Design a protein with these regions (language model features):
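Phosphate-group recognition and catalysis centered on beta-loop-alpha active-site segments
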Residues: 1-287
Length: 287
């Protein structure tokens, strides 16, 4: 696990941090559950990514909005249901069988992960004020990384409610916001970058070097949620598993990315550890 007494920059020096996408789901254990988070930590994940959905009466749950039909076999959305109904729902496993696992609250997830790893809060933009309060109430401010898109509304809400949290804007192709955010007092620790080709500015050696000189980290997505959605130029989990880890994860590490998000945390962690010499970093020199 990362040393949470150190900065995220320091923890990423020896090798890229492993971010487990919705934990590690397999067998009967669904994603975005405490069980999936525990499984990811057992495999060496440094960061857990989780999604947040808000019920009709404002309660925060760990669930990917819009995936209700896939994971809960219901036609409604959590945002349209009162919390008393959400609390009774049960998740389904990949075979379509109902499990014993319910939809965890965000407070339960924070309590489970407190002091154990970084927590990457996705869908933060759905309720920046409310999720920010939940983070503070749970006392996990120093281990949470929040992110939003780059719309004026989203960035305004971050400035107003979450400027002290570790924040990463999600940028596609070109980063034209991190410098401005830092100048506005936002604790902008870097960026999550999406790119279709390796020729795009946000994955160029010059940009990566510049970001590292400014003490910022870069977050890449190797997970594949839809093979038609290209967000890391094909340097994916699929490529890493089917062609060998150097075909995906290795190239992301060589480019200098500091955090790699994956659905295969154990495989990625073992691969990165195998690249670390007796002294040095598993990948291109960065911070």
């Amino acid at each position: 696990m990362p040393d949470l007494n150190k900065s995220i920059f320091e923890n990423a020096k020896s090798m890229p941090l492993v971010c487990a996408h919705r934990g590690s789901a397999s067998g009967n254990i669904p994603c975005n559950t405490l069980a999936a988070f525990g499984a990811a930590l057992m495999q060496g994940a440094d960061m857990i990514e989780l999604d947040v959905a808000v019920s009709a009466d404002g309660k925060h749950y760990v669930f990917h909005p819009g995936m209700e039909r896939a994971y809960l076999k219901i036609r409604s959305l959590i945002r349209l249901l009162p919390s008393k109904k959400v609390d009774k729902l049960r998740l389904y496993n990949p075979d379509g069988t109902k499990t014993q696992y319910g939809v965890n609250t965000l407070a339960e997830a924070f309590d489970f992960l407190r002091g154990r790893c970084y927590i990457n809060v996705d869908k933060f933009w759905t309720d920046v004020p409310g999720i920010s309060r939940a983070i503070r109430e749970s006392g996990v401010e120093k281990q949470v990384v929040v992110k939003t898109g780059t719309s004026a509304r989203e960035l305004r809400e971050v400035r107003e409610h979450a400027s002290d949290f570790m924040f990463m804007p999600i940028v596609r192709s070109v980063d034209d916001v991190t410098d401005a955010l830092a100048a506005q007092g936002v604790n902008c620790i870097g960026a999550e970058v999406l790119f279709k080709t390796l020729g795009e500015p946000c994955c160029s050696p010059a940009y990566i070097e510049e970001m590292h000189k400014k003490g910022r980290i870069l977050f890449a997505n190797a997970e594949v949620y839809d093979h038609k959605a290209v967000i890391s130029a094909g340097l994916t989990d699929d490529a890493s598993v089917t062609q060998g880890p150097e075909a995906g994860w290795g190239k992301l590490a060589d480019l200098g990315f500091d955090v790699i998000q994956t659905d295969w945390p154990g495989l990625l962690k073992n691969y990165l550890l195998s690249r670390v010499p007796s002294s040095g970093k598993a990948g291109a020199p960065n911070i």
